[in-house]
Amino acid sequence: MKLVDEAEIEVFAGNGGNGCIGFRREKFIPLGGPDGGDGGAGGSVYIRADENLNTLVDFRHDRIFKAQRGENGMGRQAYGKGGEDLTITVPVGTVVINVATDEVIGDLTQHGDRLLVAKGGRGGLGNMHFKSSTNRSPRQALPGEPGEERTLKLELKLLADVGLLGFPNAGKSTLIRAVSAATPKVADYPFTTLYPNLGVVKVENYRSFVIADIPGLIEGAADGAGLGAQFLRHLQRTRLLLHLVDISPMEGGVEGISPVEQVRAIERELEKHDPELLRKPRWLVLNKADLMFEDEAKAAAEQIVAELGWKEPWFLVSALGREGTFPIMSRIMAFFDRQKEEEQEARNAQ
């Protein structure tokens, strides 16, 4: 499932250092010639693609990036030190657009791709360059040139890593709000989610993954009922499915359907639409535990798991109270890490 993530940033290359006005002054050479050195070049700003990143979420807060200014020239024909370049890392697949011209500067499609987005200013010339037959002691030097400044738009087509499955009102929108910065509409009636919502879940050390809240499925979704038909296809490219089920006993569960039947009904829809979806990793999330006493919720969860013969990981949570939600996210990150290691081992074995 691909949706667009975007961010706007400002980049400032470093100004060049100023040239120096200086004269040679040594013992026995009281009236030496000009020896002012040139200023150093300003640092440039680059954007580099990094396969370890997959969202632009960090640019929500860090929007201004400045490279280092070049140092001024000095006497004795000493050149100023050049400013350090600044490299901004973004996910592979990021498109960089110049906001002022709406021009695409570059498309970073491979890990390690590097793009110059703002060039540092050249250093100014020192007065040693202005000596002539008619001017033996020039008191003239040039200032450094300003570095380039640009406002850039970063666009990334996001591939959702995790898809949320479940009947209407199973709590998918509530869960995605609890674990990410997304704010989908949440209400206590079916089909609140009319379009896929996307959230970026940040785990430790600035790592993150993308989670998609697919509109609620009902029986017949594969045949066009409810809102599910047009969104079932979005699940095909996710790496993991979280199957949310309302275990609260109120009115016998969602729309009077028992939790076990909720699971089986959606499995039937997946089977009809694409049997491969049933072979995709799918974890069971038993939600709304806050509507029951703790021991009752645990007993109900264990009974549901037993009736289903569930072999994959399962979790008992309250998305509304954020109870038990973050351990799931950490477990997902670890699962993706293992996937990446296995893929790398497979490539190395070829």
Curated annotation (Swiss-Prot):
Protein purpose: An essential GTPase which binds GTP, GDP and possibly (p)ppGpp with moderate affinity, with high nucleotide exchange rates and a fairly low GTP hydrolysis rate. Plays a role in control of the cell cycle, stress response, ribosome biogenesis and in those bacteria that undergo differentiation, in morphogenesis control.
User: Record-annotated residues binding GTP?
Assistant: 166-173, 191-195, 213-216, 287-290, 318-320
| Disulfide topology | none
Region span, Disordered = 126-147
| Assigned EC number | 3.6.5.-
- Every OBG-type G domain range: 160-337
> One cellular component GO annotation, for this chain's record?
cytoplasm
Annotated Obg domain ranges read 1-159
Q: What's this protein's name?
A: GTPase Obg
Chief location of this protein?
cytoplasm
Q: Give the originating organism.
A: Stenotrophomonas maltophilia (strain K279a)
Q: Where in the cell is it found?
A: Cytoplasm
GO terms for MF: GTP binding; GTPase activity; magnesium ion binding
Is RNA-binding set as a keyword in this record?
A: no
> What cofactors does the UniProt entry give for this protein?
Mg(2+)
Q: So what family is this one in?
A: Belongs to the TRAFAC class OBG-HflX-like GTPase superfamily. OBG GTPase family.
Q: Which residues bind Mg(2+)?
A: 173, 193
Q: Give GO BP annotations, semicolon-separated.
A: ribosome biogenesis
One Pfam family hit: MMR_HSR1
What keywords are annotated for this sequence in UniProt? Cytoplasm, GTP-binding, Hydrolase, Magnesium, Metal-binding, Nucleotide-binding
Quaternary assembly:
Monomer.
